[in-house]
């Protein structure tokens, strides 16, 4: 059966703001090769619909809060997602979706003790730790939004929007993990975007908000305005990376000739 759908998770924990950017991002970078059907789905769909794996090329988890993702999908939901990728599907997790796609998370809460715990998917087999830039993150305001210099492995220095995302701790020590980008201005330049072939499928996890399209942003908070204006000027490298990324995610990780 032809896999011609992109499913975007839209349930408890997903930020409506980042969901809109994610949908626009997928449409924007898919126009050159013909649009896929982009569907918003909830946890009930992923758990109970018996056929979604057969028609889905890419499953996307946008930004928001990871804990509700885990609470809703833990068990049967995550088992089906992992099996879907193993059998040739592709997965993209951005910010909260990247935490959700890792084996362990460690998150410095704005108040109180850090959140730490295991997650089911383990596409990154280590700890997603964040926020990578500490000090300003908030669940209720965009105070943590900032520009993040990114050193892309194949495209050089670029910039992306950041708000609460992770870095992938010790990523160099895990066989099969490909570091696609690093935080260029943080000590040790930790991995910010990683990918991994999982049997026949591809999983990509991104700490920064690579889906953010500044020309759609209407927020008036000063730090958001500065971020938007900067990224409107300095977008060439990120644009090249995103074009390449979406092209890869729209294709099978392995062709029939590779099998």
UniProtKB/Swiss-Prot annotation:
InterPro entries given in the database record: Biotin-prot_ligase_N (IPR019197), Class_I_gatase-like (IPR029062), UCP016642 (IPR015834)
SUPFAM superfamilies, per the entry: Class I glutamine amidotransferase-like (SSF52317)
Source species, domain of life: Bacteria
A family per Pfam: BPL_N
Family under the similarity heading: Belongs to the chlamydial CPn_0128/CT_035/TC_0305 family.
Protein name per Swiss-Prot or TrEMBL: Uncharacterized protein CPn_0128/CP_0643/CPj0128/CpB0130
Taxon lineage: Bacteria, Pseudomonadati, Chlamydiota, Chlamydiia, Chlamydiales
């Amino acid at each position: 059966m032809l896999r011609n759908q992109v499913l975007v998770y839209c349930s408890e924990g997903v930020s409506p703001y980042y969901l809109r950017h994610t949908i626009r991002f997928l449409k924007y970078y898919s126009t050159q090769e013909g649009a896929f059907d982009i569907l918003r789905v909830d946890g009930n769909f992923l758990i109970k619909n018996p056929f979604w794996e057969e028609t889905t090329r890419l499953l996307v988890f946008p930004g928001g809060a990871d804990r509700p993702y885990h609470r809703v999908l833990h068990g049967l939901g995550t088992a089906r997602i992992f099996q879907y990728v193993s059998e040739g599907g592709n997965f993209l997790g951005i910010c909260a979706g990247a935490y959700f796609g890792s084996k362990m998370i460690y998150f410095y809460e704005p108040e109180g003790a850090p959140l730490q715990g295991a997650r089911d998917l383990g596409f990154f087999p280590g700890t997603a730790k964040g926020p990578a830039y500490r000090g300003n993150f908030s669940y209720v305001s965009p105070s943590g939004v900032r520009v993040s210099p990114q050193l892309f492995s194949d495209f050089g220095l670029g910039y992306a929007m950041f708000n609460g995302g992770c870095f992938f701790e010790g990523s160099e020590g895990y066989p099969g993990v490909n570091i696609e980008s690093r935080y260029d201005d943080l000590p040790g330049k930790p991995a910010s975007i990683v990918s991994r072939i999982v049997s026949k499928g591809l999983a990509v996890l991104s700490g920064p908000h690579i889906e953010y399209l500044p020309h759609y942003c209407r927020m008036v908070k000063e730090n958001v305005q500065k971020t938007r204006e900067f990224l409107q000027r300095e977008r060439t490298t990120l644009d090249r990376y995103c074009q390449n990324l979406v092209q890869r995610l729209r294709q099978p990780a392995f062709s029939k000739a590779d099998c």
